Amino acid sequence: MKSERIPVKSFSADNGFIGKMQKLVREEVLPYQYNILNDAIPGVEKSHAIENIRLAAEKLRGKDVKPDEFYGMVFQDSDVAKWIEAAAYALAAGEDPELEKAVDETIQLYGASQHEDGYVDSYFTVKCPDKMWTNICDAHELYLSLIHI
């Protein structure tokens, strides 16, 4: 049996369960996640995910960023990348100028954290640049590099 791809815009889920879930994700979940990634929700532990990417971008622009300014998990860049991906799917299904602006700003920041050779990983850029590609088994570098493809 041959399968055929269906373009995202060819599918409409305006009604029913899927439509309700898409609306919930677009209007509630993605903005909430964006605020979590930006440490903008009081009373919730800071993720520092986007701040770490900002620090990496600043370091690459020559700013004196200290290794201990990085906070969080080694793999957090993927949380931001996956948020961008989810938001892109939501935007493919319908316009949302506010979400689009947040995505554009996040992509711009992400791009500013990329080394000239294409390397992107805020943990190693900020915390321990001398350890890049030394522990691909445990440090999520290979995973993060594939997330960006």
What do these predicted ranges mean?
Residues V126-I136:
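Asp-box/WD-like beta-propeller blade repeats and closely related beta-sheet repeat scaffolds
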Residues I147-I149:
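Conserved small/polar residues in nucleotide/adenosyl-binding loops
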Residues M1-D79, V103-F124:
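Low-complexity, Ser/Thr/Pro/Gly-enriched N-terminal "stalk/linker" regions
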Residues G94-E105:
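Aromatic- and glycine-enriched glycan-recognition loops and surfaces
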